[in-house]
Amino acid sequence: MNDSYFHEFGFGLAYKDGYFYATLATAINPGGASTQPQIQDRGKVIKVNKTNGELSFVASGLRTPNGIGIGCKGDLFVADNQGDWLPSSKIVHVREGAWFGSRSVDPEGTKDKKEDLPVVWLPQDEIGNSPSTPLAIDLGPYKGQMIHGEVTHGGIKRVFVEEVNGQLQGCVFRFIQGLEAGVNRIAWGPGGDLYVGGIGNPGNWGQAGKLHYGLQRLVYNNKSTFEMLAVRAKSNGMEIEFTEPLEEGDGWNTDHYEVKQWYYKPTIEYGGPKLNEKKLTIKSASVSDDRKKVFLEFDGLKDNHMVYIHLKKHFISDSGSSIWSTEAWYTMNQVPKGQNGVIKKAPFVYADNTLTDAEKKAGWQLLFDGKSMAGWRNFKKKTVGKGWVISENAIHLDAKPNKDGHWQAVDGGDIITDKSYENYEFTVNWKINNCGNSGIIFNVVEKDKYDYVWQTGPEMQVLDNTCHPDSKFVTHRAGDLYDMIECKYSTVKPAGEWNEARIKSLDGKVDFWLNGYKVVSFTMHDDQWKKMVAGSKFKDMPDFGLAKGGHISLQDHGDKVWFKNIKIKELKQNKQ
């Protein structure tokens, strides 16, 4: 509710131990500046005695505290929204006598007052814009954490909280999206389900493209999601905990992480920039024995700063799940003292075109050692054409225009593995030249009656999606099952950057992965497969997609392309 002053809302209620709690927003002029003067009761947390109705003030210094709720350990928390004296939105811990930094109600009286720091800052438009209703979550691996709604940024966010030197601080993650409206209220129902109230308004208050109203019920399905569960502060870096173990041998490469640090300074101006933003150099990455934690060692952590962690590699869990979100925002009110993270020596030194001991033990084989083309040859030939060379530690098609107008490169042509494979997992890193086209073709049959690998083998497309003509066609883009199934997500990197591709084929069930995302799944040889082939450009090729195994091919489509870290693991056929 609100009175005649713009934005002078009252928010709540939360109930705890015989008292109702609410928050009172300050009055705001059109445009966002605080009204002057303010009523002295504004920007406060109030509590009301359930029995006799007596009202008292608990905390002050808030701006637009849209939501108060019971969070972790049964304490009260408030979501406050960006504005003057508030450089970004935040979640605060309600304590008796706390003052949260807004000076608009009493500019002179609060001039020298020390602000109670937020549990988490919510960097504007990165992980928040209009936060609402903090609540505890007591389900699955998230027990002891908090969630809150978001009106404009949308969805529900999750907050891990820890106590450092008596001060609560923590990390915020993406959690839930895809709801029907911006989220203004969330509440747990008597059966343990989460009820979500949506809202919106024309202009800049509401999630773009969503309804301006809504009520939805979310039910926890007891299924695991692979994601960052927690990020913890250490004296010498940060520790990331995942909900599932990483793949064997993964997580040790410092190039797969990015860490930045900055701080905010409240002023009378609306919002505020990131100040002294710096990228921190990661000295080492250490993986725990259970592969569920990674400690990032780096110098330069400072009190009263934000620490941003980005997983540059889209990790895959040991069970084959793609990670849900790759970013975390930690509010470092205080750097812990005497709490160093565990630094371990990496079990291997990563190098292109090599296998780790763990990979060897798991059955992986190299198909390219970075030194020779052994194991590869042109389709229906015994050697590799001179157009294929070794460059940048990769098999490279140094494509030169064909003067006779042929679409393939001079002395190039498609190359194939010497050996045929049926049930396997295949991985490769590839990059393509500007506006280039290539492909990874599998189940290739080599017989005299076939002139090209694609007369029998399906293709995982390799493409520069930005400017190759094929990018205009759905199912012709990078990662697609060419001309049949488009990617679920667009995950390809720009031309000139390395992509990680994976093909898993087992008993006719095939998955394509691109840069850590499972982008395409299908089953070969069933009625649906036959229907897809009949509707594709391969419909007049009688043997297309019929083979249960075959050679793996790297395509010459007349454009420069590179392939490295080419590995395969043969899989056992499932018992029928």
Q: How would you describe each model-predicted region?
A:
Residues 237-250, 298, 311, 367-373:
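A short glycine/threonine-centered beta-strand motif
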Residues 42, 103-127, 269-279, 478-487, ...:
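Surface-exposed acidic, glycine/proline-enriched linker/cap segments
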Residues 342-576:
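Carbohydrate-interacting regions of secretory-pathway proteins
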Residues 245-284, 310-317, 326-330:
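Short, surface-exposed alpha-helix to beta-strand junction/turn motifs within ectodomains of secreted
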Residues 300-305:
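Surface-exposed, short loops/turns at beta-strand junctions within beta-sandwich domains
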Residues 287-290:
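Blade-terminus and WD-like Trp-Asp/Gly-His loop motifs, strongest in beta-propeller folds
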Residues 1-234, 248:
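Beta-propeller domains with acidic blade repeats across secreted/periplasmic ectodomains
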Residues 222-226, 247, 311-345:
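Acidic, Ser/Thr/Gly/Pro-rich low-complexity segments and short DxT(G/T)-type signature motifs
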